[in-house]
Amino acid sequence: MATAATAAAALTGATTATPKSRRRAHHLATRRALAAPIRCSALSRATPTAPPATPLRPWGPNEPRKGSDILVEALERCGVRDVFAYPGGASMEIHQALTRSPVIANHLFRHEQGEAFAASAYARSSGRVGVCIATSGPGATNLVSALADALLDSVPMVAITGQVPRRMIGTDAFQETPIVEVTRSITKHNYLVLDVDDIPRVVQEAFFLASSGRPGPVLVDIPKDIQQQMAVPAWDTPMSLPGYIARLPKPPATEFLEQVLRLVGESRRPVLYVGGGCAASGEELCRFVELTGIPVTTTLMGLGNFPSDDPLSLRMLGMHGTVYANYAVDKADLLLAFGVRFDDRVTGKIEAFAGRAKIVHIDIDPAEIGKNKQPHVSICADVKLALQGMNTLLEGSTSKKSFDFGSWHDELDQQKREFPLGYKIFNEEIQPQYAIQVLDELTKGEAIIATGVGQHQMWAAQYYTYKRPRQWLSSAGLGAMGFGLPAAAGAAVANPGVTVVDIDGDGSFLMNIQELAMIRIENLPVKVFVLNNQHLGMVVQWEDRFYKANRAHTFLGNPENESEIYPDFVAIAKGFNIPAVRVTKKSEVHAAIKKMLEAPGPYLLDIIVPHQEHVLPMIPSGGAFKDMILDGDGRTVY
């Protein structure tokens, strides 16, 4: 296979190509040649080998270049192949340097929030660090929601922002915002680079911080004069994170793992409660379940970490979880909480949650242990290592023979039969649950699903079959509307050739609808699946249940003509040159979804659904399992 250097050398011999075409050809050839991504070293120094010299980079290894070029080279050394960047005055030096990169492709979203959500989904769906770049001032502040989202959902991201020149910092200069201060509480760490020689070290540290321990977002703010300053990069500068590295969790001790297995052996009704912290541990988790026979329920972030079609799957628990998952946790005598944080949407009334159970909590973040629910046994460690250790102990002993949870399985199977997920059918009205079931059937549960936030998000969690980690992409902790479309685009960039569907609501979709331009220009095969009820459906559901159906600004259509579908998403999509179809009858759904999936490139399907439908089951906020609501909808007076 050709190396990056030989690919570059072959291109340097082309004397008739224009600089623009040569740059494009060089970029494509080099990307194809790079079969294995370069990884930023965790505890060792970055590779001393300079990127291949090309006509785009006329300097030698020991010759000065701009700080912006040093930044881009540092990104390359950390394995970056895709960035999501929108240019502006304080970041244009970085964009100029990106045009000189033979490796990195920029994906031009139409809003900084969109690009940052895309970077988040890129990371969620691939496990690689997502990178977004914005200019100073409003460009930087437009990243804020996505950074807060990434912190709550433990997503490895590096956000790079341009800043006004150093001499202007603090003068209220044009487009100056103290973004380090703004983001201090919504990032894992952040930097203001004041010395061009710090760029190689800072970038290496940023990627290490973002991806190690509990992952999270890191922001790097770089003044424009630093970007323009000439310097010779010192690639062998080591990281300087002694305190952080010393506090990283160690591999779990065998005696603690043996204690957990003893509790499993003593239990009769154990339940595994699995969250987003198990995203990298799917194989180990499945093996642990195979060895023990413990039923599994997942959080919203944990969907796909254990196959939801497995006989031992209880699917999702919590506010809109299944009856049988919440029943299992309520009746359990042992709760194994792996990679979770006992979020309020899961636990409801915290005192009543798993009230009969001994609790084992394994998490990589010591701050989460005992924060909301005090465990009986806690292990601060990487869940993957803990599962590997317990599997090794189980495989090397006869402990497995002592696990007999047959009667517990029978009890839960009875709950599944008595309380399956379900919905009512009203003639030709399209029930949103039905539309998702058809999508699941036609994709065989293999698509990557991104969502916005609202009722459609919960129905997508309930009615699609998730079979593997990183298949489900949603703003869980922050609940940020507008996540779905840019997230689907970011996932499509990270996973070429994989079907990606944005299951969205009309409210969420409209918040970042401008990214239709991006998916059309890059011809990404993103399928936009809008469940359009002309309302903020989840808020309407709460109005119905708790506010006597008093509508307080939740109708999103045209109040002068409520029968009109407004806005016209089909017309808007066609304005972006994206094929689109609207369906209003149940009998049209199967053929319409099939056509959407078979169409090359992007496609929008506008599915008109009733606004009276409610997401059920539902445990009211602050309630317990005994308070679960199982029936009713907006057609009922409460």
UniProtKB/Swiss-Prot annotation:
For the region Thiamine pyrophosphate binding, give the residue spans: 455-535
Bound cofactor: record note: Binds 1 Mg(2+) ion per subunit. Binds 1 thiamine pyrophosphate per subunit.
Start and end of the transit peptide?
1-39
- Print the keywords alphabetically: Amino-acid biosynthesis, Branched-chain amino acid biosynthesis, Chloroplast, Disulfide bond, FAD, Flavoprotein, Herbicide resistance, Magnesium, Metal-binding, Plastid, Thiamine pyrophosphate, Transferase, Transit peptide
- In short, the EC number is 2.2.1.6
Which molecular-function annotation in GO is an example for this chain?
Answer: magnesium ion binding
Cofactors that this protein relies on: Mg(2+); thiamine diphosphate
Entry annotated with the keyword Nucleotide-binding: no
Name the source's superkingdom.
Eukaryota
GO BP annotations listed: isoleucine biosynthetic process; L-valine biosynthetic process; response to herbicide
The family this protein is said to belong to: Belongs to the TPP enzyme family.
Q: What is this protein called?
A: Acetolactate synthase 2, chloroplastic
Record the organism: Zea mays
Give the classification, highest ranks: Eukaryota, Viridiplantae, Streptophyta, Embryophyta, Tracheophyta
Point out the gene that encodes the protein.
ALS2
